[in-house]
Amino acid sequence: MKDGRNSFVATNSSRSTNKHFVLVHGGCLGAWCWYKLTPLLKSAGHRVTVLDLAGSGINSKQVNDLRSFSDYIHPFMEFMEYSVPGGISAKPEEKVILVGHSLGGLVISKAMETFPEKISVAVFVTALMPNITEEIDISDVVNEGSTGDSIYTYDEGVKDKPTTFICGPDYMSSTLYNLSPPEDIALAIMLMRPVRLYSMKDMLKEIAISKQKYGSVKRNFQCSIIEKDPTDEVKEITGSDHMVMISQPQQLFVCLQEIAEKA
């Protein structure tokens, strides 16, 4: 973010010192984007899981294989279902802290609705966060004309809406990584992969949220959304861009540590 501020969301539950963090990347990225934050969390005694969503990072799926949002988030949802304890036998300290960045906010929102009993805290890092009372609108996130040299494909014809998107180098340097080290920008340009642009109809169907489940996991978000949907805690990181885990990993770690201590 060019204004140098980033915000998160948090909820409360168990009170064990060492937590299990699950880090979920945004569109066009992969698990690799957490490489600075992961060792910081581990050095504090936390367990950390980083996942590649389908068609991202080193995941073998290709973007055109992912016909629905469920296909895209399948590796993460499978992990939440089978690798995170749940049910009446689960201990409070086994709950996870979810951290979603950018598009990853919608991914962890799906988990909050599906597995609320497995989550102690949900953290939205410059991320999309659904509002219980309003429809999701991501049209302004990847609108053509607002993303510079980014590339769109039209697999269903140029008269239809674009089907995939990948960040362009200039757009990344000027908007997403504008306060990040140049070597990290170079690395990201090499590792970017296209993300599928799902229709609003598909997104609304896939991320149907309720106050009883999704709403039971306390949350927070960026300034423009907080006004519409007041939430629980906001933390701001100065001197950061959209890629806060790259530009200000130490400050992000401190914020997450504070959240973990309250959880």
Q: Residue ranges of each PLM-predicted region?
A:
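Catalytic active-site module of serine/aspartate enzymes centered on a nucleophile-bearing elbow/loop
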Residues: F8, K19, P230-A263
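Conserved HGGG/HGGXW glycine-rich cap/lid loop of the alpha/beta-hydrolase fold
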Residues: S13-S60, E94, T114, K118
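Active-site nucleophile elbow and catalytic-triad environment of alpha/beta-hydrolase enzymes
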Residues: L187-G215
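Short alpha-helix in the alpha/beta-hydrolase fold that links the catalytic acid
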Residues: M203-K205, Q222-I225
